[in-house]
């Protein structure tokens, strides 16, 4: 593995104006990382990666490299069209160096910050604020950290072990608290957080509400929404011939997961033609390689217990696709997965005064990530809609800096503790046991 990585690193031309770095949403200094590796300074290279991107072990596996660093590599312009595969290099350096990350928390500055959601944006903000001395608590509605990375990306692409290791090295060792199974906006509200001394709150909750197509049959037992299927695919009994409605990255994840779960036939349906596929070319090519089929210009109109009814669509001169009346066809399937898009949950907004949203239900923020409620910041999918992990990290880094500046500018809190001088209970832990002489 190491020799292969070095072979790949040696192909880097060390450009003075590195296009690869420009193509990276968080501007990773790729030439310098590669130079350090080639000079046998792996630890320095790893440190540089993690300082720039706390989720570098994740991004090395799930980033859309073909359109970012590798897609911008100058070697693409050569006749051989063979870019340096930095994803391989980043994965090797980050996973190797991560095992050496055992340092404890930074000195505390006396201020607390709350992070709602443990997806890529929330984890990035939490790690950075803790690095700068804040006492950070993460609140997440699920039992394990990771958000969409754990519950929306299949394990074959991003193993749970990567996120488990992240929790140990970047959260537990750094003193970051995690409250699982705690959905802010229900029992606990944003107002409660400020009451309990948090000086600032970051909202990084993801898009967990599946958007329905509102066609007949979506409630049937052989149907599922993509976001629910990916969260726990083994829980669904959809048979061995599955239709997937959608051709985005999540749809590819659903299709490839179904194959791994034993489906013999999986077919993706798209309302438009092949040029409108929104999934990455890599994901589509892997899906086809694994046996996933595609049907284009098919608009689903009804889900049935034994299949899917679609209507043909045609592309007009204006570029829009319209359905052809009378062209309905029944396609037999044992199960149907609807994977078209996701929306945001609004329980948090409903229970918090002063936070505004747009027509899509996404949070309204200023350039610095601040919401319309003082002290509350937001980023990631909750603001921009569905984005990639690295895009969420890039946004979160800027918001973390804004939160840091905001909290540093707050007046000192000199409110005395009304219970500072009360006596400390020092008798046996149980009065009952004490009375029994135990």
List the predicted regions and their residue ranges.
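Ferredoxin-type iron-sulfur electron-transfer modules in oxidoreductases and energy-metabolism complexes
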Residues: 1-9, 29-58, 79-106, 438
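FAD-site-proximal beta/loop scaffold in flavoenzymes
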Residues: 219-239, 321-386
């Amino acid at each position: 593995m190491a020799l292969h990585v070095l072979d790949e690193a040696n192909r880097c031309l060390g450009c003075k104006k590195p296009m690869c770095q420009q193509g990276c949403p968080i501007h990773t200094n790729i030439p310098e990382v590669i130079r350090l590796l080639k000079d046998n300074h792996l630890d320095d290279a790893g440190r540089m990666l993690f300082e720039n991107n706390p989720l570098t072990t994740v991004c090395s596996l799930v980033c859309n490299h073909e359109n970012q660093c590798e897609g911008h590599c100058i070697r693409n312009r050569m006749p051989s069209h063979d870019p340096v595969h930095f994803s391989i290099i980043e994965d090797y350096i980050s996973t190797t160096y991560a095992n050496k990350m055992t340092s404890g928390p930074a000195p505390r500055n006396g201020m607390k910050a709350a992070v709602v959601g443990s997806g890529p944006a929330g984890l990035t903000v939490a790690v950075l604020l803790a690095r700068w001395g804040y006492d950070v608590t993460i609140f997440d509605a699920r039992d394990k950290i990771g958000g969409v990375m754990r519950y929306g990306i299949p394990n074959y692409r991003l193993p749970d072990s990567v996120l488990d290791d992240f929790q140990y090295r970047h959260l537990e060792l750094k003193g970051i608290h995690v409250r699982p199974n705690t959905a802010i906006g229900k029992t606990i509200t944003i107002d409660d957080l400020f009451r309990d001394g948090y000086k600032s709150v970051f909202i990084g909750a993801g898009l967990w509400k599946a958007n329905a197509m509102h066609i007949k049959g979506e409630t049937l037992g052989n149907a599922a929404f993509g976001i629910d299927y990916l969260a726990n695919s083994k829980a669904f009994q959809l048979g061995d011939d599955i239709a997937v409605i959608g051709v985005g990255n999540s749809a590819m994840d659903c299709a490839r997961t179904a194959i791994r779960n034993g489906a013999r036939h999986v077919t993706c349906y798209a309302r438009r033609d092949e040029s409108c596929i929104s999934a990455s070319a890599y994901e589509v090519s892997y899906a086809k390689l694994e046996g996933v089929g595609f049907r284009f210009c098919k608009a689903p109109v009804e889900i049935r217990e034994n299949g899917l009814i679609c209507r043909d669509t045609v592309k007009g001169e204006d570029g829009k696709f319209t359905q052809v009346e009378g062209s309905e066809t029944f396609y037999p399937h044992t199960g149907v997965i609807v994977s078209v898009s996701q929306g945001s949950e609004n329980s948090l907004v409903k229970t918090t005064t002063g936070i505004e949203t747009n027509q899509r239900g996404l949070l309204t923020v200023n350039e610095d990530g601040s919401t319309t409620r003082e002290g509350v910041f937001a980023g990631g999918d909750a603001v921009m809609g569905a984005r990639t992990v690295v895009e969420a990290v890039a946004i979160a880094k800027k918001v973390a800096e804004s939160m840091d500046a905001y909290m540093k500018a707050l007046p000192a809190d000199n409110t005395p503790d009304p219970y500072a001088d009360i006596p400390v209970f020092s008798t046996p832990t149980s009065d009952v046991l004490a009375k029994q002489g135990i």
